[in-house]
Amino acid sequence: MSPSLVDNHAAAYIAAPSSAKAPMIQKPGNTFGMSSPIESKFLSQPRDLGIVAVGFSGGQCKPGVDAAPSALIESGLLTQLREELGYRLHGDDEVHLYTDLVPKEDPPHRNMKNPRAVSNVTKRIAEQVHSHAKEGRLVLTLGGDHSIAIGTIAGSAKAIKERLGREIAVIWVDAHADINTPETSGSGNIHGMPVSFLTGLASEDKEEFFGWLKPDHLLSVKKLVYIGLRDVDPGEKRILRENGIKAFSMHDIDKHGIGRVMEMALGHIGNDTPIHLSFDVDALDPMWAPSTGTPVRGGLTLREGDFICECVHETGSLVAVDLVEVNPTLAAPNDVGAHETVRAGCSLVRCALGESLL
C-alpha cells in the first residue's frame, strides 16, 4: 500500500504478507455448548467460514484502520471461531494490503478521494468474497474502512443470485448512512458513499471508477435497512426520504427499544431473504468503542450491538458479515481504548456467528 494510505505507525500493527498463502486450519474445534443450533436457510456449508482480512484505509483520511484485521486476529478472534464455535476456516493467513492495486498518483474524480485505489481494491474484495460465497459458505470480512463494503456486498450479492436466484438484503449498522453520492459528499471520502454505489444511486461508466459494478452486484433499496443512525448529512436525509429507505435512528431505538426495532427491521426484510450484515463499530457509543475514525456520542451500548447480531443470526438467513472501522492506532499511549474497541469488535462477530449466552 502506498505511503499516502498507510503510515509506519499503522504498518506496525499489520502482519507482513507471507510469500506463500498458508491455508487456514480447516478442522473444526469443539463448541463447548456455546454455539447456537440455528439451522441455516441459504448456506449449503453453514459450518464453513470464508475469511477475508482487508488491511485497507483508502476510503478515508485517517491511517490505522488498516491495522484492524491484524489486531482482531492477534486478539484470538479466529481461534475463538474455530475452537469455541466450531467453524472450519477457509482462506489464508494473510492480511491483504493490496499494494499492487494502489496507484502512485490518484487524483480526485467527481469529488472522490483515492477513487482508483478504492475501485481497484473493492473489485478485488468482491472477487474474494464471491469465491467463498459461491461455495455456500458464510463469509466474514474484517476491515478496513467502510468503503470495502462496495466489494463485500457486491461479491455476496452476485454469488447469491448465481447460486440461489435470490436478491440479498443488507442490514447496515452504523452511526452514519454512508449513502452520499460523489456530488452530495462534503468530504469526498468514499467510506461515506458505498451504499449509493451499491444501490445504483451513484454510478460510473469507467472501469477504473467503479464501472466494474454490474446489475448482478447491486442491492435493491427495498432490501436495505439501517440501524443506529445519528449523524446523517442533509443530502443523505433527502436520499433516504426520496427512496423510501427503511432506517432506524437512535431516536427509534430510544423510543421502542432494540428488541422492537429488530422485530420491525427483520419484518421489513422478510424471512425468505439472505442477509448480509455490515457492522461499523462506530454504531456503538464511544464509551464502548472509542478507537474508531468518526465516533459519535449517543450510540448503541455493546449489549445492544451484540443483540442486533444475535437477532440476525437467529433468523437463519445470515450469509455474510462485515466488521469495519476499528482503528487500533487512534488510542493514546497506555490508553485501553484500542483494546476495548477490538474486544467489542470480537464480541459482535462472535454473536453474529452464533455465540449464545446460555
Swiss-Prot record:
CDD domains: Arginase
Places the protein is found: Cytoplasm
Principal subcellular localization: cytoplasm
Residues that hold Mn(2+) 1 according to the record: 146, 174, 178, 280
Catalytic activity from the UniProt record: L-arginine + H2O = urea + L-ornithine
GO biological process, one term: urea cycle
A Pfam family it matches: Arginase
Keywords: Arginine metabolism, Cytoplasm, Hydrolase, Manganese, Metal-binding
TM spans (from-to): none
EC number assigned by the record: 3.5.3.1
One Gene Ontology cellular component: cytosol
Positions contributing to Mn(2+) 2 binding: 174, 176, 280, 282
Family per record: Belongs to the arginase family.
Protein name: Arginase
The organism's taxonomic lineage, starting at the top: Eukaryota, Fungi, Dikarya, Ascomycota, Pezizomycotina
